[in-house]
Amino acid sequence: MMQSVTVQQEPAESIQVAIGLVAWNEERGIGATLHSIFDQSIFEELNRRGWKCEILCLANGCTDRTAAVTGEIFDQQSRQHPNRAAFRACVVELGERGKINAWNQFVHTLSAKEARYFFLMDSDILIHRRETFWNMLQALEDDAQAHIAVDRPCKDILFKPRKSLRDHLSLAASRLTSSAEAQLCGQLYCIRAGIARNIYLPKDLAACEDGFIKTLVCTDFLTRPSASSRIRVAEGAAHIFEAYTSPAAIVKNQKRQIIGQTIIHILVDGYLKTLPLYKQARLAYTLEKKDRTDPEWLKRLIHQHLGQTRFWWRLYPGLSGLGFQRLRRLRWRERLVCFPAAVASSLLAFVSGRLAFAALRSGCTNYWPQAQSKV
């Protein structure tokens, strides 16, 4: 079931930007997220150019008042925002829970067909800089080679005046992750609509959809070697998210990541490369049709992969020792600072990898740990 509540209507032909806010049971925290969105300078810039923006809150499988709270804020902003002429806002209630379905619905069904740029974002983050959205959009406007613009993700613990040893370890782990080129954080990014519309997320992808999108975009849909230039980091753009700090939450999150990366490996390094070029060129149509006509196809591929994989560290290439691989990209001084995080990362991979391996063998792919609290 899908129900749409439109708060403000504008002529559809003027929509240039569409923002998809994916929300699940965020009644308590979504207000802060929405206010950080409406504080963005992008609405003033769009208004100046005569452009329009639509904001869709994709409330998926919610059992609380997320949709109602969002609708109230949308109604208030549509009446009081100084640049209210530059946007329309809509709450969409999706009966099916999950980011994968919400993403597909937004990109292929719900967003304005004439939109040139999509912002995809989670509903439990805060936009840190007022110019973030506009700088991300400008990054794509100024660089024809880039298809995705990203900002800088900041853990909330970064702003603590007094950081614990665990906080420092967590921040060092983030430094290791950011050392790789072409990083795509699924919490917030801007993508050219034409590129997004050729991507369909298989329903059993489970997690790490950002890794799947990154691979397709950087390889021009698997037609050439990966090019990091397809993803552009926007200057002066950042958002804040709540860091996992408890050992249990960290292990659960890493378990989810390993499950997702395993499925991406099965798809990208296996199945998709066997497709004829004409099917790769129409990848969204190909994968959507596969999901529709053969709903169990990806689960069979996962089962087949597990039958050929004896040990957890062989779920996908580079799983073991990933922290030390990332450490080599850093300068010597940074290596010393981040060495404890690399050790912790390897130990975490050992624990989470075994749990992910067991979960996959038991047929569990739709695993999603709940955040500890709201930002």
Regions found by a protein language model. Give the residues of each.
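Short, acidic, metal-binding catalytic loop of nucleotide-sugar glycosyltransferases
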Residues: H35-K52, Q76
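A conserved acidic beta->alpha catalytic loop
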Residues: G50, L56-E72, E96, I125-L126
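Conserved donor nucleotide-binding strand/loop of the catalytic core
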Residues: A68-N101, T109
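Active-site nucleotide-sugar/metal-binding loop of Leloir-type enzymes
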Residues: N101-Y117
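Short beta-strand-to-loop acidic/aromatic patch adjacent to the donor-nucleotide binding site
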Residues: E114-L126
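Conserved donor NDP-sugar-binding/catalytic core segment of glycosyltransferases
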Residues: L126-K163
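A short, conserved alpha-helix in the catalytic core of glycosyltransferases
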Residues: A206-S229
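Terminal low-complexity segments of carbohydrate-biosynthetic enzymes
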Residues: K252-V375
